[in-house]
Amino acid sequence: MKLTCMMIVAVLFLTANTFVTADDSGNGMENLFPKAGHEMENLEASNRGKPCHEEGQLCDPFLQNCCLGWNCVFVCI
């Protein structure tokens, strides 16, 4: 029973990994959640009113709440 569960989890993980890392020549992954036009034109204004975290501070990788120019991997880098 444990082996069956492990096999199911492994297959699900590998399937999800395949979809995430698949080459998308149309850059579809980048355009899943496009920003509004005014946010793309004025990035500083789009972050106004939202708290952001500076480099080295803890952040939420799902919310991507680092200040402009920083990427979130549990810590803004």
Swiss-Prot record:
Propeptide span(s): 23-47
The organism's place on the tree of life at top rank: Eukaryota
Subcellular localization: Secreted
Expression across tissues: Expressed by the venom duct.
Tagged with keyword Acetylation: no
Disulfide bonds: C52-C66, C59-C72, C67-C76
Signal peptide: 1-22
One GO CC term on file: extracellular region
Molecular function, one GO term: ion channel inhibitor activity
Keyword annotations from UniProtKB, A to Z: Disulfide bond, Ion channel impairing toxin, Knottin, Neurotoxin, Secreted, Signal, Toxin
InterPro entries according to UniProt: Conotoxin
Transmembrane regions: none
Pfam families the record matches: Conotoxin
Family assignment from sequence similarity: Belongs to the conotoxin O1 superfamily.
Domain observations: The presence of a 'disulfide through disulfide knot' structurally defines this protein as a knottin. The cysteine framework is VI/VII (C-C-CC-C-C).
Listed name of the protein: Conotoxin Vc6b
Taxonomic lineage from the root: Eukaryota, Metazoa, Spiralia, Lophotrochozoa, Mollusca
